[in-house]
Amino acid sequence: MRLLLWVLLVTLVTFLSSGDAAPVDSNKQLERAAINKVTSRNLANDNSLKHEKRFLRGDRSNIVNLKDGDENEERKIGQKMTTALKSIKVWYLKWEQKILLPGFKKMAKKEMTYSKLMDRFRVRMMNSGRWGTPSGFKRYGRLYKDYLISINRADLTV
């Protein structure tokens, strides 16, 4: 059931982020003619009317007559969603650093090396039934290693 929910969510995000709508006035109107046998034959031969090349929605390099406000009229749900998710991610990473830094400082004072930290995680997980170190522990170790490099304690990253 969770897999189905994830598939639906990923499908929704994919559709919302991949579609852009073109402004209404990006395509020039074709000249309209009365429909009769003569004009329909001429349309088929492309002789009588001046047909200008129509722009496809994705071909924005050829679009002329765009005003400054036309870009805002497009539906940008996917872009809004992406920026909202990015801002949530930035907020979470700042919050996480605020929580983790005091522990990193204590471990650096005790001169705990990166390899000792990872060994401690392995010993903790020994009787848990898992075969390896979970990704959360690996990420914690990687963040600790980055912290040690940032405070110029590269000797502890071994």
Swiss-Prot record:
InterPro entries listed in its UniProt record: RXLR (IPR031825)
GO CC field: extracellular region; host cell
Localization, UniProt: Secreted; Host cell
Top-level taxonomic group: Eukaryota
Signal peptide residue numbers: 1-21
Alphabetic keyword roster: Secreted, Signal, Virulence
Pfam families for this protein: RXLR
Chief subcellular location: secreted
Gene induction: Expression is induced in presence of citrus root extracts or during the interaction with the susceptible host.
Motif RxLR-dEER: positions: 54-75
Record remark: domains: The RxLR-dEER motif acts to carry the protein into the host cell cytoplasm through binding to cell surface phosphatidylinositol-3-phosphate.
Function summary: Secreted effector that completely suppresses elicitor-induced cell death in host and enhances virulence of P.parasitica.
UniProt similarity note: Belongs to the RxLR effector family.
Protein name in the entry: Secreted RxLR effector protein 2
Source species: Phytophthora nicotianae
